[in-house]
C-alpha cells in the first residue's frame, strides 16, 4: 500500500486548479531532512529566520515595481511571500481593474496620452509617502518609465486612485521620489525631446530639445468626507455635530468645500473654530494637484534618478544625468553629418564625468507662486534662466553615467555611483552650500547654469568595485550598502571614514537594492533585499527567459 501511494506521488498530483510535479520524501527528524536534501546548519538557520507559520504576520512589507507588467508587487519580509499584485497601468481581470468596474476604468482613462489609450506601462521607482522624512504608510507613488506617467495608490485599500500624464516629457526614468512631508513627488525626464508635440530635426537639438524635472504637488486633503464613526469621535472631543449625519459619505473637493459644508450644518464660526479637529477625523483622499504643479526646465542632457534633501538639506533635490556629451542619435554637439557619426555608447561615454542637477525646490515653488513661469501644453514651466537668477539651479560633476543619488539620513551627504566608474563619490552639502553662497563656480554650462567644483564639494571617494549603482543606509551610523552590477556583489562600506568593510556575493547581476527604511531619516537596518536582474542556473528551467529574483540578506 505504501509503495503504491509513493509511486503515485512521484507522478503528477492534480488538486483543484493546481498541478504539483515532483517527488515526496519522508523524514522524521531535522537530521534526516538535512541528510536527504544535502542541507547545512546555516541553511536551516536561514529557513527558520524566514519561516512564518499561518497567522504570523511579516515584520515589513515591500513594494516592488513590476516593470513591464505595469503593476506593483507587494510581498512580506522576512517571509518573502507575495501578498498582492496592485494593478496600476495595466488592466487586471482578477481584481476587476479596468474590466467593468467603473472607477478603475475611469482611472485607466486618465492615463490616455494625446487621446490614445495606453493600457500597459513600465513601472520603475515606487515611493512611499513620508511625514518628517519617515514613511507614514498612507500612499504609494509609482512611475511609468515608458509613457511618462505617475500613479497614486491609496494604502488603505492598496488600490490605484489616480494616474497623471506628464504633459512635457516623452519618456522618463527618474521617478518617483518624495519630499520629506510629501509636499511634492519628483519626476525627471529621460530622453530629451521638444516640449511641443511637433517634429524637430536633430539640427535643432540644442535649441529645441529639453530635459526637465517635474514637481507634482500632492494634496492629502483633495477629497474629504465624514463617516458615522468619525462623527462620534468629533462629539467626544466637544465638536457640535447636529446635522452632520446628513453629510456622511458625501465627498467634498478640498478643505475649503468641506469646511463650508460643515459650516452650513453647525455654523460657519463653529466650523472654523474646530477646523483642525474636523480635518483630523475626516476621511481623506490624497491626489496630485496638477494645477499646483510645475516643471523646472533642464538642458537636453538625459536626466536620471533623483532624491529629496532632508534635515540639513531639506528644500533641495538632486537629479543625476547621463550623456552630458549631448550625443543623441550618434550625433555630437554641432555635428549632424552622417560621415562623422559615432557609435551611440562611445559618444555618450566620452567624458569622465556627467552632472548632478541641484535644485532649490522651495525657491522654485516661490517662482511658481510669483508667476515666473510660462504655460506649455497647459502646464507651468519655469525657465532655466529664472532658476539661475534666483540662485536655485546648479550643476555638479559626478562619475560618468551615474545611476543613483542617495542622500544620507541627516541630509548632510549625498552618495553617487557612476556605472562606468569603480568609485562611489560622497559629496558634503555644507561644502556645496558654501560654494553656492560664495558663488565659487568652476564653470558655466552652455545654458548658463553654474557648475560647481567637484573636488571642492567632495567629502571622499571610495573604490568599491565594478558597476556600482544604488546605495541604501544602515541603522549603524556611516554604514551603507551599494549594489555592484558587474561584480554581482553588495559592498558594505563606511561613507564617513571612506573605507570598504566587506562584500556579499549575490546570485547574479544585482540592480536595485533596499534596506529596511534605508532611504528615510531613521533606517532600521535588519534586512537587505537584493533585486537581481538575472538568476542563471538558480531555479528550475522555465524557458529561455531567465527568471529574476529578490534575495533576502540578514544584515544584523
Role assignments for model-derived ranges:
Residues 2-13:
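Bacterial N-terminal signal peptides that target proteins for export
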Residues 5-7, 18, 36, 286:
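Short, intrinsically disordered low-complexity segments
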Residues 26-556:
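Predominantly soluble domains enriched in secretory-pathway, periplasmic, or organellar proteins
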Residues 12-22:
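Bacterial N-terminal signal peptides
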